[in-house]
Every structure is written in C-alpha cells, then in structure tokens.
Amino acid sequence: MAPTAPPILDFSPFYGTDGAAKAKLVQQVRESCEYNGFFQITGHRIPRELQVRVMDAAKRFFALPLEEKMAIDKNLNSFNRGYELLRSQMLEVGTAPELKEGLYIGEEIGADHPYYINGRLNSGPNQWPATVPDAQEFRETSMEYYHAVYELAKDVLAVLALTLDVEESFFDPLTEGGVATMRMLHYPSQPKDEDEKLNRGIGAHTDFGCITLLLQDEVDGLQVLDAPSGQWLDVQPVLGAYVVNLGDLMMRMANDRYKSNIHRVINKSGRERYSIPFFFSGNPDHVCKCLPNCCKAGEQPKYPPITVEDMVRGAYKQSYGRAEAYKKELAEKAKAHKIEAASATAMVS
C-alpha cells in the first residue's frame, strides 16, 4: 500500500447520538494510533472565529520589535513561560538550532498556587507582552483559546480511552490538574536554496507528552515520517482542522502499541508560517503505567511507571541542551579560527 498523509476524521460523532458513527470514529482513531499516531480532526467544537482571533493575536505579537519581545524572554524564569528567541531549541541532531520563534502560554498559575510554590512542570504566571496592540484583548483571546483546546484535548483522550476498550472517563485522573503548554509559533521564510539538511523550522522529533493538537495557518511545511517506506509526507493544512498526534508519554503508556511518530517542519514556501500547537502533558504527579489491553497476558510491560513531571522535564532538558552545546561548539570554532588567523598574520609580518 502506498503511504498516505494522516487521515482527516470527522470528530462530530463523539458529540452525537449515532452509536454506529461513534464506533466508526473510534476505530479510525485506533487505526491511526497503531499506524503512526497522526490524524486530523474536523467537526470539533472550537469556533472558527476563535481560531481566527488567536492566529491574528499571534501575528500581532511576532510583529513587535525584538527588544520588546525579549522583555518577556522565557529564560528569565524557571517555569517555561514567555518568549523564545529564534535558534533556541534543537530537536534533531546534526542540524542547526531551529528557525522558529515562539510565545509559551499556559494556565495562569499565581505565586500562591502549590504548583508554583513547589516548582512543578511548566507552572507559573504567564509573561504577557506589555506593548502588543490591544494588549487586554490579546490576553483574553489567548486564554479563551487555551481553555477551549484544553477541553478538546479531554475529548480526544476520551476517544483514545474508547480505542482501548475502557470507559471514556479513564483518563480523568490524568486531565484533572493537568499541565499543558500552548505555543504561538512563527517560522520566517527560508530561502529556497538554503541547505535544508541543516536548517529546519523544527527538526525531526517526536513530542514529549501525551497528545498534541496543532492549529496551522494556510502555509504548509509540516511533514510526518512514514516509517515503513521512509518517505516524508506533507500534512496539508485543512481550514479549521486540528492535527492530532500522540506523544512519547502516550506511546510509553500504550507499551508501544500506539505510536509517537517523527515529524518536522521545513518552511520552503517563501512565506512566513504561523502555527499554534497545544501540548497536553497531564497532571505532573500522575503516575503513567501500562494502559489496559496494551500488554499480552503473561508479558511484562516494556517500561516502568514514571510520573508526567519526570518524563516531560527530562525531554525538555535534552532538546534545549543540544542547542546550547551546538552554539558553544560554533563559538569555540570561531575563536580557534581567529587565533589561527592572528598567528598567520603574525608569521607574515
């Protein structure tokens, strides 16, 4: 069978009363999870008008001067909120740090919240840009959208529970008090002749947490690896749809029955690209262990239990550590080159 891009599924039967249509949706999601963990959904409950507003908000933020964006640099705090500069992250070994900038937003966690006090995963107050046009509307739209997608993530997890032949409510302990990160992302256009082996909008990687729900604009660039054929498949934007993919934590809980698949972004369109992924991790203290019907009788799970906090925090450290190591290596090479050049000049004179 020729490889095909992730299927586009009508999610509306989840909300309806047609049992056969709902069973068909569950089977389609199950097949997608077993193949490569990617699918797109339409027929959800997030209004198109809200999607348009939040995408417009993202564009207003990224149009700000760099110094104004850097005023909320996420490196100024320990809870992963705020602005991320271009080339800050490196997910694919052997490439340059990534050609994207972002704004990280999550649930508002005040200084008196136990998550903030105890330094839990990605938990703290949002770092809002002071100079973005219509600043109050920017904040309100961002949080309205965050909460809407959080509810959709819960619905997707309910369908995932049904694919495992357990109750829709199975993942409720994971979603109660769950941590999620919404990123507004901007990919500058890459020159068409730029070395795509080195330059990525986002390098080839798998996501860290449970599930991701991605809102794309009309500019393509997202590619999913079809493992059996080794081909990269374009995930064409579908107006109003969400690209859903499973993360490493879900694959681990599913004992590798379900897949967290490799994907990347290469923006060779000649245009700027914007997207808003929503990364759902879960309650930081939730202990993730082998899910029902994912381990054959008499077999041991492949992985020991792990908390959401430990799994996701470890993955973050790795990807950002690679970028810093790469920059350090470049600086050392530049320094060595200067020393060599100075020595050569001295010998000539």
UniProtKB/Swiss-Prot annotation:
Cofactor: Fe(2+)
Binding site for 2-oxoglutarate: R273
Record: residues binding Fe cation: H205, D207, H263
InterPro entries xref list: DIOX_N, IPNS-like_FE2OG_OXY, IPNS-like_sf, Iron_ascorbate_oxido_reductase, Oxoglu/Fe-dep_dioxygenase_dom
Record-level GO BP terms: small molecule biosynthetic process
Domain of life: Eukaryota
GO molecular function: 2-oxoglutarate-dependent dioxygenase activity; metal ion binding
Tagged with keyword Iron: yes
Induction summary: Expression is induced by nicotinate and 6-OH nicotinate, subject to nitrogen metabolite repression mediated by the GATA factor areA, and strictly regulated by the cluster-specific transcription regulator hnxR.
Pfam families in the cross-refs: 2OG-FeII_Oxy, DIOX_N
Keyword terms: Dioxygenase, Iron, Metal-binding, Oxidoreductase
Function: 2-oxoglutarate-Fe(II) type oxidoreductase, part of the hnx cluster involved in the purine degradation. The nicotinate hydroxylase hnxS accepts nicotinate as a substrate and catalyzes the first step of nicotinate catabolism. The major facilitator-type transporters hxnP and hxnZ are probably involved in the uptake of nicotinate-derived metabolites, and the oxidoreductases hxnT and hxnY in the further metabolism of 6-OH nicotinic acid.
Full protein name: 2-oxoglutarate-Fe(II) type oxidoreductase hxnY
Species of provenance: Emericella nidulans (strain FGSC A4 / ATCC 38163 / CBS 112.46 / NRRL 194 / M139)
Organism ancestry: Eukaryota, Fungi, Dikarya, Ascomycota, Pezizomycotina
Gene that encodes the chain: hxnY
